Structures are given as structure tokens and as C-alpha cells.
A protein has these predicted regions:
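Cell wall/extracellular polymer interaction/catalysis modules
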Residues: 96, 129-143, 147-148, 227
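Short, high-confidence coil segments that cap the C-terminus of an alpha-helix
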Residues: 90, 117-120, 213
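Conserved donor-nucleotide/metal-binding helix-loop-beta segment in metal-dependent transferases, i.e.
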Residues: 102-140
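Nuclease catalytic cores that cleave nucleic-acid phosphodiester bonds
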Residues: 60, 88, 103, 128-129, ...
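Catalytic core and acceptor-binding pocket of nucleotide-sugar-dependent glycosyltransferases
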Residues: 144-238
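N-terminal anchoring/stem segment of glycosyltransferases
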Residues: 1-76, 86-89, 195-198, 210-212, ...
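A conserved donor-nucleotide-binding helix/loop in the catalytic core
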Residues: 67-96, 107-108, 203
Length: 238
């Protein structure tokens, strides 16, 4: 079994991943694989490979395993959240958003091993907000999703007794062990996305609280990390 699979998902080349994630110089390691789920495979191919010039890593391109009929974001979220359903035969997975470039460091030694020694789940700590109630207000202000849907979601959590100021993650990177406990976490997380907003940061902390699952904090944040370089959507690095 592969030790670690780093993976992502892109639809309609939304993140322009050939200039971001796929162009990563990266760091080749035994036991670490790289997988991208995409709808851009030619002629219904079951798989392909991609290696950028100057890169140390090779990406395995796989077709999407599920597609929402109307919302490409929910299509991507399915692959992001359901790591246990993607035929990722590995001890651990690391989800990375398509807006990130992998820096030339050992993800196994510097990211995964320290986390795996203590946690089955980890993500970035949000750099600006400290709970899902604040996140919902920010998402409403920025018109990130249907405001009624988000309000109903947060009200449901409040009715259950979910506390304020209970932490907030930034899910540009999500580390997970491939365990039954994490499969249960994924299932409940996806259930929230299916019922409510596709903004997965609104439900991650609720699900961890509901399942009494302690999660770790990945050092840094989406835009400032020792592991990744952030490239805004639609832009490429110099």
C-alpha cells in the first residue's frame, strides 16, 4: 500500500491547474503518489499521467467519480470530502486545493509524519475568523452561497447546542488517515454539504464536534504556508 496520496479535483479547468498545482516543482519520495480527479481526460480515457517540465513529481489523472448536474463546486466537494470512496489505496491522504503549488520539500517528513503521530485529521486554522457563526456572516456578506440555505444550516447547529467560538478551519489542505473513524467523519461532512451549503468550512467544525473528533492544525494558512505557494484563481506565478 502507498503511504501517502496527495490529491485534488478540478472541473472545467476552474483553477487553471496547469499553471498552479500541476506545475509544482515538488519533491519526489518513495511511498508518495499524486492524483488529480478531472473532467478533462480525452475521449473518455480511464487515466493519464502529467509531469510538468522541471517538476520532480508525476500526477496520475483520473476521471471524476461523481458529478452534480448543476453545480461544479459540489462536484469538486464530493471528491474533496469523500476520501474513503475514491479508491485511494494509501495510509493517509492530503487534499490540496487547485490554487496551491507544492513547494520542493518532503511532505512525508515535514507535514504528514508530525501530524500522523498525533491526529487522524488536520487542516489549516482560519487566519481571520474563529467560529462557523462568524464564517456564515462573512459568507453572506461576500455572497458565497444562498443566504437562506446558510442561515438554516447555522440555525440547525445552534438548535443542537453547537457552541460559538469553537474554532474554524481553512480547508485548502486537509490531512486524513484512511480509517473507519475518518470514513464516518467524511460521511457526516458530506451529508451536511448535500443538505445545506457547499461551503465546507461551515460544517467541518460542527462534524468534528458532533463526533467528538479532535483534529490537528496544519502550520500556516492557505495564503502563507511552508508547504504550499498560493496562486489566486485565474493567475499564474511569475
Amino acid at each position: 500500500m502507498t503511504k501517502i496520496i496527495v490529491y485534488s479535483c478540478v472541473t472545467n479547468k476552474y483553477d487553471n491547474v496547469e499553471k498552479t498545482l500541476l506545475s509544482s516543482v515538488g519533491f519526489a519520495e518513495d511511498g508518495v503518489k499524486f492524483v488529480l480527479f478531472t473532467d478533462s481526460l480525452a475521449n473518455g480515457a480511464k487515466s493519464d499521467i502529467y509531469k510538468a517540465k522541471g517538476s520532480a513529481i508525476t500526477w496520475e489523472l483520473r476521471p471524476l467519480l461523481w458529478r452534480h448536474s448543476l453545480c461544479k463546486r459540489r462536484t469538486a466537494r464530493f471528491h474533496k470530502i469523500n476520501s474513503h470512496m475514491l479508491n485511494l489505496d494509501a495510509e493517509c491522504t492530503v487534499w490540496v486545493d487547485g490554487s496551491q503549488k507544492l513547494k520542493p520539500i518532503s511532505l512525508s517528513r515535514q507535514l504528514v509524519t508530525p501530524l500522523a503521530s498525533r491526529y487522524s485529521l488536520a487542516s489549516f486554522k482560519h487566519p481571520e475568523r474563529i467560529c462557523i457563526y462568524q464564517e456564515m456572516q462573512a459568507c453572506r456578506k461576500l455572497k458565497k452561497d444562498n443566504p437562506l440555505l446558510m442561515r438554516n444550516q447555522i440555525n440547525a447547529y445552534k438548535t443542537e447546542g453547537y457552541p460559538p467560538y469553537n474554532g474554524l478551519v481553512e480547508t485548502a489542505c486537509v490531512f486524513r488517515k484512511q480509517t473507519q473513524q475518518i470514513a464516518e467523519f467524511n460521511k457526516l461532512w458530506w451529508d451536511q454539504i448535500s443538505r445545506y451549503s457547499f461551503r465546507d468550512q461551515l460544517s467541518f467544525n460542527y462534524v468534528a464536534w458532533k463526533l467528538k473528533l479532535e483534529y490537528g492544525k496544519i502550520p500556516g494558512c492557505r495564503t502563507s504556508s511552508q508547504f504550499f505557494e498560493f496562486i489566486p484563481h485565474g493567475k499564474s506565478s511569475p
